[in-house]
Amino acid sequence: MKEEVKGIPVRVALRCRPLVSKEIKEGCQTCLSFVPGEPQVVVGNDKSFTYDFVFDPSTEQEEVFNTAVAPLIKGVFKGYNATVLAYGQTGSGKTYSMGGAYTAEQEHDSAIGVIPRVIQLLFKEINKKSDFEFTLKVSYLEIYNEEILDLLCSSREKATQINIREDPKEGIKIVGLTEKTVLVASDTVSCLEQGNNSRTVASTAMNSQSSRSHAIFTISIEQRKKNDKNSSFRSKLHLVDLAGSERQKKTKAEGDRLREGININRGLLCLGNVISALGDDKKGNFVPYRDSKLTRLLQDSLGGNSHTLMIACVSPADSNLEETLNTLRYADRARKIKNKPIINIDPQAAELNHLKQQVQQLQILLLQAHGGTLPGDINVEPSENLQSLMEKNQSLVEENEKLSRGLSEAAGQTAQMLERIILTEQANEKMNAKLEELRRHAACKVDLQKLVETLEDQELKENIEIICNLQQVIAQLSDEAAACMTATIDTAGEADTQVQSSPDTSRSSDVFSTQHALRQAQMSKELIELNKALALKEALAKKMTQNDNQLQPIQFQYQDNIKNLESEVLSLQREKEELVLELQTAKKDANQAKLSERRRKRLQELEGQIADLKKKLQEQSKLLKLKESTEHTVSKLNQEIRMMKNQRVQLMRQMKEDAEKFRQWKQQKDKEVIQLKERDRKRQYELLKLERNFQKQSNVLRRKTEEAAAANKRLKDALQKQKEVAEKRKETQSRGMESTAARMKNWLGNEIEVMVSTEEAKRHLNGLLEERKILAQDVAQLKEKRESGENPPLKLRRRTFSYDEIHGQDSGAEDSIAKQIESLETELELRSAQIADLQQKLLDAESEDRPKQRWESIATILEAKCAIKYLVGELVSSKILVSKLESSLNQSKASCIDVQKMLFEEQNHFAKIETELKEELVKVEQQHQEKVLYLLSQLQQSQMTEKQLEESVSEKEQQLLSTLKCQEEELRKMQEVCEQNQQLLQENSAIKQKLTLLQVASKQKPHLTRNIFQSPDSSFEYIPPKPKPCRIKEKCLEQSFAVEGLQYYSEPSVAEQDNEDSDDHADEEWIPTKLVKVSKKSIQGCSCKGWCGNKQCGCRKQKSDCNVSCSCDPTKCRNRHQNQDNSDAIELNQDSENSFKLEDPTEVTSGLSFFHPICATPSSKILKEMCDADQVQLKQPVFVSSSDHPELKSIASESQENKAIGKKKKRALASNTSFFSGCSPIQEESH
């Protein structure tokens, strides 16, 4: 018996989660508002929805469970089925609400979801009912990509055995699903935890732990009274955690994730269609439960025998407003569903009758499934053109098959021949090895013919004759081996050309056999090329081995020479070290000067001998390295030969395997052909039978056709009358058709424009959401920088700041960051207001009744025709445009395929050229080895001639050495005299410097040897010197160069200013003298004509400043310091520190100075005159005699010239009030 109750609606609970951190960072705002004390939620400004329960973001899990779910559990113990369904967008909190990620460790956690709380409540109620016996069974499944997977089964293979069956009395059953009997709550929790671990979860852009499947946790409860065994109740509790609906542009899913999302949305769409059908009475009784497996499993829960609660989970963020609105509408439609739950009573007799009825129904279904008819074939005769093309095609196919057969046979024969060649090569290698052993035994060649003549023993003579014959046989065998090697190379080349010249076969009907033949031909070609390359490599290796054997004696000889040379070098090195030590000791002792000179000469001789020996040693080592490189090349060639042989063996094995597979395939195909022929015979028999039946039916149809013709004639007359009436009606309707068409066209155009503008608004809304997300990220970054104390970036979005704001003090930086944050937050609020306004307009435009109102405006068939005509015209134009685009796309694809074919051909051509180049390279290497062998033989001959020359030259060298020693002794004596002369010159220059310093200290005019500064690139100028009485012209033997002489003329003394008139008188007696050109080695400083601004200047290139020794123009020079004169004066004081100290005339000390200098900068004219005077001084040469006292003579000869230079300087300084006018100006510090 079943006790029926009234239909009750599906209860709906709305739960809203709080904003997550990602949404807060993106600047999302809340788009939902809740009415206090009422189960009502408002979207935007005026869009409201009412449900059974509404839970705002602050509601806890326990309140949700006690308010909405707990009443269902009490009905379960009364025999009612119950379902708790969680639906919503991905990331809206469904799994959190249901407790899909629950573990045993979270038992006392307040945030546990619905499923663990249901388990606790169930066992709590069971413990209270002691007069009932309970049997609880648990099952857990998931629907992943429209496949049912058992989460309690360890192996996923059982998933193929799970099927859905429908029982008219008990409802939906799942056959093959694992059900576990549980006794306590911990067993149930362990089953839940096991299923949660097996459930498919993945990460998307919206949720890091997104459920990728629909999960259903079912608890089956059977309760019996202990006193009455016949009365029992059965009930099921389904706890459903649906996967969230998602959009690909937000989740950014790809690959498997995208496929999963498509299947999830498909299942939810079918569920929505079922909910719409159940909630709308106008659509009739048909409900599309069979569109997906999810709706079939929930068939009892929606509109069936169950108390159902739907928990709609939504996100409050305005970026998810569209999905939130869809969820709210979805839940609102679910409230209209009416379920009819009943108490499930299960007596045994009712169960038996039910099973019998089920068997009968299944038998009927089975009989119906075996019935059916075969459709008749339609024979169409081909045209003559088609027939000729088919015949031509058949002939080409037969020819192709014949050619492919011949190609496969030729490939097989080639493979066999190549295998034989490989075997003969292996035998040949063994014979060559034995032949090599015989050659080694025959290495010591003896003139056996003479030995036979001298021997007397007859038996010994016979043995020696046999040995002679064997030697002749060995020589013949070696010649034959060389000929065979060349023959194999030639045959490999011929076979290669044969394979290459084979014609390309077209595609035959039997694709597999053609591919097999082509593969065999390709592998045969590769094998031939491999044999050819192997033969070339072996010949090259053999040639290089012969060269190595010939190099062996040369190597031993060179090794001995290297040892001898190294010993000689060591002995000479020791002798050199001893001489160096003796020279060092001799320097300390002045009496051993001659002996040290001999030792120094001997040291130079030893160094020359050591250099010659090292050179010879290096040449010998080069030849040894050549031997090592050839050995390395030979080993590398042998390794390549081994690899090529292995490759050849693998290729042969592959060819055999391919042939075996082809043989098996051919055998199987022959067997299938026999079976098909047998079936064809049976079909021919059935066809004859059907033809007889068809003949009988055609006779019956002929009679019926005649009857139908008579009825047709009567019908024609009736239709003619109806046509006349229709034409009259059409004339009346055509008048109003034109106005209707125009009206429908305008209306459809307006509707399409509204839909297009709605889509554009959605696009603008997405753009605003992205902009707000970027602004929120900028605000978060600025706040982090403000907390960390960093300066703001140089460039910020939507605002620019001045240089002072960016690089100001810390307080200014903090103010700028605060202003930027304030500005961005203002823009963020503006974007949020724009988003809310757009969303509200979209809500108004996309009302739920809009599609219904749109089609209800078409009331008559005439309006529908006009609308369809307009839409068809638009569709045709769009189709034409699509076809044009497709044709252009196909053309581009065809051109791309042609380009790919050309590329493939070019690649093949390149590979062919590469193989030819490798062969040429091997041949060139052979020629190189032959040349090396020839050069080595020439080298031996040249060494022999060198030894003979060395023996003849050794006697002449001894005579030359004796004369060389005598000359060395004379040179040592001369060197000692030069050293003494140098010491005297140094003492003379030191005395000269002291003399000039004394003259300066006594305020007399210094008489120094003037230095010659002649620029290397300046022209030689002849300046006539002053006349000197009784001047003796002497040959210049030595040129002196002193920088100190210029430093004394930089600042004239007060006494020189007083004697200005006398100097002017002396200048009139000036006599020209001939200049002497100075060598470039004695010149210091640069001689630039320009600004000294780049590295062409010698001073700047050496990273030094230009000074007075430079011949550049000081007015143009940019490489001089302003305080050059002061630094020169300081250096002069430091040089004369040992004798006395000169005071700086520019230094002014309060109370000590005898006058106060006037601060005045020199004019450009004065500077130019002084620079000209300095240049004249630099360019005038001097003659230095080599008498007993050359320094004193030079001072006397230059006294007249020094007066002329001093006169020009005094004239320049007299024009100003201070002698500071000739110096560089010094910047005064502001006090």
Curated annotation (Swiss-Prot):
GO BP: microtubule-based movement; mitotic cytokinesis; mitotic spindle midzone assembly
Q: Which InterPro entries match?
A: Kinesin-like_fam (IPR027640), Kinesin_motor_CS (IPR019821), Kinesin_motor_dom (IPR001752), Kinesin_motor_dom_sf (IPR036961), P-loop_NTPase (IPR027417), Tesmin/TSO1-like_CXC (IPR033467)
Residues where ATP binds = G88, Q89, T90, G91, S92, G93, K94, T95
Locate the Phosphothreonine modifications and list their residues. Answer: T800
Instruction: Give the coiled coil ranges.
Output: 351-1000
What family is this?
Belongs to the TRAFAC class myosin-kinesin ATPase superfamily. Kinesin family. Chromokinesin subfamily.
Give the protein's recorded name.
Chromosome-associated kinesin KIF4
Q: What is the lineage of its organism?
A: Eukaryota, Metazoa, Chordata, Craniata, Vertebrata
Could you tell me the gene encoding this protein? Kif4
